[in-house]
């Protein structure tokens, strides 16, 4: 998680996450676009669709993320990093496959970026400024907004309040599968790794 945060800071790139990856990058950081996929944010899904370079670190391109595989991010070059070679190219064809331990790869990438000239970070952020402007427009849609009520407890509001009351504690969140799982994933900002325990593709209850 620390090396991932450093990479995002060095590059100025936006970052999103799958359901199982929540917490690997701080959920309250401005460069985090929220969760990706069927139950993800408008900005995360549009950024993934329109990007020119996609770096997939340890995710498997499942159907909840890709939708129609032939329409998934059609204009991007795709780099897929995974320690398991059988996971690469299984669902989505990629342009560069890297079989590696993620921590070691991130260390190497960060080292190379740091070896660039001192103006690299600021110049790279300038190059992505228009991209961030577009992301800002998508964010204005506020895709996870809901109409609160003073008559009933809205689940989204309950999760948000839980976050506010526990964000300064070392909190672990667990769910089974279903709609409440999606509300938790959408409205609780996981800021540390391994604090989110939930069933993914197997859908166990």
Listing of model-derived features with the role each one plays in the protein:
Residues 16-18, 56-57, 100, 173-177, ...:
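General beta-strand structural signal in soluble alpha/beta enzymes
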Residues 2-6, 11, 43, 94, ...:
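Conserved catalytic alpha/beta core of Sir2/sirtuin-type deacylases, generalized to analogous enzyme cores
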Residues 21-130:
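Glycine-rich, acidic loop regions that bind phosphate or pyrophosphate groups
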């Amino acid at each position: 998680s620390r090396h991932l945060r450093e990479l995002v800071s060095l590059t100025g790139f936006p970052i999103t996450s799958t359901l199982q990856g929540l917490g690997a990058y701080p959920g309250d950081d401005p460069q985090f676009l929220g969760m990706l996929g069927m139950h993800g944010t408008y900005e995360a899904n549009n950024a993934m669709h329109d990007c020119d370079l996609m770096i997939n670190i340890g995710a498997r391109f499942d159907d909840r993320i890709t939708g129609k595989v032939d329409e998934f991010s059609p204009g991007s070059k795709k780099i897929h990093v995974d320690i398991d070679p059988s996971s690469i190219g299984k669902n989505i064809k990629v342009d560069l496959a890297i079989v590696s331990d993620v921590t070691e790869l991130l260390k190497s990438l960060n080292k190379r970026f740091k070896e660039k000239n001192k103006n690299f970070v600021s110049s790279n952020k300038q190059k992505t400024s228009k991209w961030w402007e577009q992301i800002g427009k998508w964010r204005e849609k506020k895709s996870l907004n809901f109409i609160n009520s003073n008559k009933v407890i809205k689940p989204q509001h309950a999760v948000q309040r839980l976050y506010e009351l526990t964000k300064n504690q070392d909190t672990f969140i667990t769910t089974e599968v279903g709609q409440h799982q999606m509300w938790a994933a959408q409205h609780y900002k996981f800021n540390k790794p391994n604090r989110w325990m939930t069933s993914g593709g197997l859908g166990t209850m």
